[in-house]
Swiss-Prot record:
GO terms for biological process: L-leucine biosynthetic process. It holds the Pfam family Aconitase_C. The gene is leuD. Keywords: Amino-acid biosynthesis, Branched-chain amino acid biosynthesis, Leucine biosynthesis, Lyase. Its EC number is 4.2.1.33. It comes from the Bacteria. This is 3-isopropylmalate dehydratase small subunit. It catalyses: (2R,3S)-3-isopropylmalate = (2S)-2-isopropylmalate. The keyword Translocase does not apply. GO terms for molecular function: 3-isopropylmalate dehydratase activity.
Length: 191
């Protein structure tokens, strides 16, 4: 995983509510366990339209997806955040996310940011870049408005350090070894 740094990017706007995981990446592309190449299947059915937002040259290299309400609903599939991160997205902004999509995203270096409806509307009506500061949990809108967002401390730590759950445990190896050395295993008298 790549450490999550503060960044600034214009927004790719997808003003569609209730985008489910099958629309993010259709089920026919879920046979792989590799993340490589999933960006080509991201929003595959919609990308058949040459005017779809991801097909526009000005969308290339942008790192923030501004999505409609209830983004990532539907079935649990880790391929959805994989495809989004393979495209280059570091964050998705919406008023709400499906819980399982939110958890899958946090475990795969994609920051889901929930904002109030008024901020959401402001972002859809603005054109400049937004700034994301994960350590301070702030989103700065193109107009300069600073908005606090929530993220649990464990996920925040993992994103900032660029580690997954196993990486986090491995970071604690010296402390675990010290604890085990100072607490000998009990003798099993029944053996």
């Amino acid at each position: 995983m790549i450490p999550f740094t503060n960044f600034e990017s214009r927004l790719i706007k997808l003003p569609i509510n209730n985008v489910d995981t099958d629309q993010i990446i259709p089920a026919r592309f879920l046979k792989t366990t590799s993340k490589v190449g999933l960006d080509k299947q991201l929003f595959n059915d919609w990308r058949q339209d040459p005017d779809f937002v991801l097909n526009r040259p000005e969308s290339q290299g942008l790192q923030i997806l501004l999505a409609g309400d209830n983004f990532g609903c539907g079935s649990s599939r880790e391929h959805a955040p994989w495809a989004l991160t393979q495209w280059g997205f570091r964050a998705v902004i919406s008023t709400s996310f499906a819980d399982i999509f939110k958890q899958n995203s946090l475990k795969n270096s994609l920051l889901p940011i929930e904002v109030p409806a008024d901020v959401h509307a402001e972002l859809f009506s603005s054109d400049g870049p937004a700034k994301i500061d994960l350590p301070n949990q702030t989103l700065t809108t193109p107009s300069g408005r600073e908005v606090h967002f929530e993220v649990d401390q464990f996920s925040k730590h993992c994103l900032v350090k660029g580690v997954d759950e196993l990486g986090y445990i491995l970071e604690q190896a010296p402390e675990i070894a010290a604890y085990e050395a100072s607490h000998p295993a009990p003798i099993n008298a029944l053996a």
